[in-house]
Regions:
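Acidic, surface-exposed loops and disordered segments
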Residues: 1-209
Length: 209
């Protein structure tokens, strides 16, 4: 069995965590160093991760998450944010390649023009959906890397967006795509894995039918 296959098969959405377990700073650093390689449209890197380990702030989050107990027992709660205006930072992202001669001035100008045309031409709804779409790709990669480091996770959308935004003073240009609880799963309370559709029910080739 390949290591990736093993990680995918062992990853579960943990509903119960062992309370009081601390995640070393070293683990967070190693996870996020790998996560830098996640994909994003035009490499403009929409994602921002707000890591909450402070017990007081976690309890505030728990209240905003309708008192879900796993927010209390998790070692950390990660808010995964997507920047709707990430495209406006594209010049900074690509300037290094221009300065190093990896990209010509013509290619640089054309790339920046294409990015601006895409995001500004399609408007605010597209900017929002792109922030969520790209950040969700990143979040899945985060959970796989965390599992590889021995940590369990659970993606969540059951929380009051406005309350969470207010608690952490999150700027309006950031969408809260999801929340991830993280820690060591209490596997004694684990439920059986839910039913999964056969491949033939969710995969088709060359046409939908």
């Amino acid at each position: 069995m390949s290591e990736l296959k093993k990680i995918i098969e062992e990853r579960r959405s943990a509903n119960n965590f062992i309370e009081g377990v601390k995640i070393p700073d070293k683990d967070f650093t190693e996870i996020f160093e790998l996560l830098k390689l996640d994909p994003s449209c035009f490499n403009i890197q929409h994602s921002h991760y707000l890591v909450v380990t402070d017990e007081g702030k976690k309890e505030q989050l728990r209240k905003a998450a309708f008192n879900q107990y796993k927010v209390h027992t998790a070692s950390a709660v990660i808010l995964v944010l997507g920047d709707k205006l990430a495209y406006k930072n594209s010049e900074n992202i690509y300037s290094g390649m221009l300065n190093l001669g990896i990209m010509s001035k013509l290619d640089y100008d054309n790339t920046i023009r294409d990015i601006n045309n895409l995001y500004e031409g399609r408007g605010e709804d597209f900017q929002r959906s792109e922030a969520i779409r790209n950040t969700s790709l990143s979040a899945m990669m985060f959970m796989l890397i965390a599992k590889d480091k021995g940590w369990d996770t659970c993606p969540m959308i059951g929380f009051n967006q406005d309350e969470v935004r207010q608690i952490f003073d999150i700027p309006e240009n950031y969408e809260i795509a999801l929340m991830i609880t993280m820690g060591k799963e209490d596997s004694s309370k684990r439920r059986m894995r839910g039913y999964r559709k056969p491949v033939g029910e969710f995969v088709s080739f060359d046409s939908f039918q």
